[in-house]
Amino acid sequence: MRYSVLNFSVGPYERLARRWRTFEELGFDGAWIADDLNVPGYADFESWALLAALARETTRMRIGTLISTVRLRHPTFLAAQVVSVDHISGGRAAVGIGAGEPEQNARVGNPLWSARETLERLDEQAGILAALLRGQPIAHDGPFYPTVVEAMPQPITRPRPPLLIAAHGPMGLRAAARHADVWNCLGGQPYGAGPNPDRSADRSLPEAAAEVERLMARLDEACAAVGRDPTTLGRSILAFIPERVTDPFESVDAFDALVGAFAHLNLEEITFYWPPLDMAFREPPSPADEARFERIAAHRILDRPAGPGATLATPKEA
């Protein structure tokens, strides 16, 4: 099992850099940046420029976005950003993509897309990225992203930086089955839960684990439908913590409860929010919060038995 952390791209930069150095010192296997722009009341850096800088603050962790929404970038531009960070980091880049949220269209001047069009775009973007991240030329005549790229820099990571797709519904799961190296979901909580005032659908840990298990069964079916061996597709979760579930960095027992709830699923990676999601939109963690986080991470991440590897798996051949 790998443990990673998701951080928001809120400055000042010096605090982010210090935090990422701490993540690595505490033994986290990866660190992710949430990728968005112009969120109301939320002064965020551009994620890939930020990752290029944070790559120089770290030496070991796999780094990337969780997720880069298909609503913000053309896939050729995103591929160039990923490969650039792969070189700057010495071969540690990964990229997560997903459908994102409808309001993101307006932030970059795009018309609103239907849910179906958004997921069709996700599938098309994933196919383009799957080729370009290998450094392959491409001539693609798709409906949304007609693309001709004659040359791409070869990545340091071979055969390519890992491509993660976050998906919950049938079309997204099929896109993951076709193109992804790793699938991700929101820890069994309702999609789009986020900082949502309506929390009536939030699930307990056993309920959330059961939902992840159901999604994994549907993912296996999607793999079968496209002729892919499901064992070649990694599985991961983002541990979204609703109010009815104690944050895993409240105590060692809370950490063990969350990890234990998903242990039977043989996940490849669990990603935790830090700071917690509710702090991303208000004041940062207090020194006491940070000290508790570091203490629990030291007990359960830094001091764990040596595992099979320290980074998110590179692509497996289907």
Residue ranges and their predicted role:
Residues 1-318:
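Active-site-adjacent structural elements that line small-molecule/cofactor binding pockets in enzymes
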